A protein has these predicted regions:
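Extracytoplasmic small-molecule ligand-binding "clamshell" domains
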Residues: 27-106, 236
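Short loop->beta-strand "edge-of-pocket" segments that line small-molecule binding or catalytic clefts
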Residues: 30-47, 136-153, 186-187
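Periplasmic-binding protein-like
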Residues: 38-40, 118-123, 130, 200-237, ...
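Ligand-binding cleft/hinge of the Venus flytrap
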Residues: 54-69, 136-142, 152-172, 199-204
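Short helices/loops that flank or line small-molecule/ion binding pockets
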Residues: 72-92, 162, 174-193, 202
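A ligand-binding cleft/hinge motif common to bilobed small-molecule-binding domains
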Residues: 86-87, 94-106, 187-214
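A conserved helix-loop-strand patch within extracytoplasmic ligand-binding domains
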Residues: 114-158
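Ligand-binding clefts/hinges and TM-proximal coupling segments of bilobed small-molecule sensing domains
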Residues: 151-162, 240-279
Length: 279
């Protein structure tokens, strides 16, 4: 009888110890795990801005929503593949990219522009040998005589084509630069925050940035999550708004040299602005 009583007491003590351990482990066990796209080692200087901004948003909501963990997926995914994975509950939970109708129909956007107005202004990456050719372009009709290069699934590709600008596409971003070099197309519209770092990376390819033209069209850059994860979207949105309110969003944005360069280029107002309609 005493042996049975001792066994019962021992079992109760073990159960209590187990509950205590579970309580101590609970914050880690229930932490929100957010898988984001891999950042390629050769990614441009501003690429880390997006996961850092996501981290900032989740930090701002820890008091109300609990702990979290951001994990980078271990393989590189194209933007269309990222969207497909999120849509079907695959290997990543959040992506960041320019928006379009299809993406917003399939995924859930957090409608706070991550790049402010930077993604709305495009400069033209051209062959240096074509500088005089572009110097004579005064309007959109003249630009339509030349061919642009862009990614096959980029939101910008739809905008260019909708405005009558011929576009040669590539399935991979990295293939566009050799295509420009050998004359497959005449220019690459690049975000005003992207072009100068790309020019530096391809310093030996004979490229230049056309100095007189802006293409202007509004393609906000958003975080996207699955339509089955509205609670994640709501948390990110609340966190971003809190960061906007206390100034930490702008502080992170303004700490990126490429963003500073882009905003200065917009503010200078030295370029002709060709307005494009977004379909």
């Amino acid at each position: 009888m005493h042996a049975v009583r001792r066994a019962i007491i021992s079992a109760l003590l073990l159960a209590c110890a187990g509950l205590s351990g579970a309580a101590q482990a609970r914050p880690q066990d229930t932490a929100l795990r957010v898988v984001v796209p891999m950042l390629h080692p050769s990614a441009r200087e501003h690429a880390s801005y997006f996961p850092r901004l996501l981290q900032l948003a989740l930090d701002k909501t820890m008091a109300t929503d609990g702990p979290y963990e951001i994990v980078h997926y271990d393989r590189e995914l194209t933007s269309p593949r990222q969207a497909l994975e999120i849509k079907h509950g695959g290997v990543i939970d959040v992506m960041w990219d320019g928006t379009n109708r299809q993406r917003e129909a399939e995924l859930l956007p957090i409608r706070i522009s991550l790049l402010q107005e930077l993604n709305d202004y495009r400069v033209l990456l051209i062959r240096r040998s074509d500088a005089a050719r572009f110097a004579n372009i005064r309007n959109l009709e003249q630009l339509r005589m030349l061919k642009a290069g862009a990614g096959v699934n980029w939101p910008s590709t739809d905008v260019l084509r909708a405005n009558g600008l011929p576009v040669v596409t590539s399935i991979g971003y990295e293939y566009l630069f050799p295509m420009l070099r050998v004359g497959r197309f005449d220019y690459m519209p690049r975000g005003v925050h992207e072009a100068w770092s790309e020019l530096q990376q391809h310093a030996n390819d004979g490229f230049d940035i056309e100095p007189n033209i802006f293409l202007h069209y509004r393609v906000p850059y958003y975080f996207f999550v699955s339509r089955t994860r509205p609670e994640l979207a709501a948390r990110i949105e609340r966190g971003l708004k809190l960061a906007q309110k206390d100034g930490s969003f702008d502080a992170l944005f303004n700490a990126i040299p490429a963003f500073q360069r882009g905003m200065a280029e917009i503010a200078a107002k030295k370029r002709r602005v060709f307005e494009l309609k977004v379909p």
